[in-house]
Regions:
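Short loop/turn and low-complexity linker motifs enriched in small/turn-promoting residues
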Residues: 6-24, 28-41, 45-170
Length: 170
């Protein structure tokens, strides 16, 4: 209990694991050990996600982060560390699920599309919305070499200009 009170969940987890067998018949100890294990696991998982934020581009990781934040709600009062991590992960998740305004610049003759997303069309300039992620912009024009422009969009990239112009003749 002292380790938990000190917000040292790793040490509390180690101690609870060590004595779990000795107190196998004590339901209260087992419940407390389960709770300590749960808080420790939440802290560990959230720390890992915050350490590699670009993983939040993947839908499965977004779902995992949402689940962790939800699971942590009942334990926030017991751990300032968990509260801090949960808040940080929630803010990070929000930044990766907020669409960005991206400005596509072309020459009014190149047909532009975003691979696996959709068509932009033949435009001089158009603002589209995309979530943070990795994209390939494709420019096609009859009689010209098709170009591909790989773009990594991250939170804060709103307003970024992407130029897609097929200019090399076949």
């Amino acid at each position: 209990d002292q380790f938990a009170a000190d917000d040292n969940w790793a040490a509390a987890q180690k101690l609870a694991s060590r004595y779990r067998q000795d107190f196998a018949t004590y339901q209260r100890f087992q419940q407390r050990a389960d709770f300590i294990g749960r808080v420790h696991q939440l802290i560990t998982s959230m720390t890992q996600l915050l350490g590699s934020p670009d993983d939040l581009i993947k839908p499965s990781t977004k779902k995992l982060a949402t689940g962790l934040i939800t699971d942590a709600k009942s334990a926030l009062a017991f751990s300032p560390t968990l509260t801090k991590l949960s808040t940080a992960l929630n803010e990070r998740l929000t930044s990766y699920t907020t669409p960005l305004d991206i400005i596509v610049v072309s020459d009014n003759v190149t047909f532009v599309e975003v691979k696996s997303v959709g068509q932009v069309g033949t435009v001089a300039q158009k603002t589209i919305q995309l979530l943070p992620g990795d994209y390939v912009f494709v420019g096609k024009r009859k009689g010209y070499v098709t170009i591909q422009v790989p773009v990594a969009l991250r939170p804060g990239d709103s307003g970024k200009e992407i130029s897609v112009i097929a200019h090399e003749q076949i």
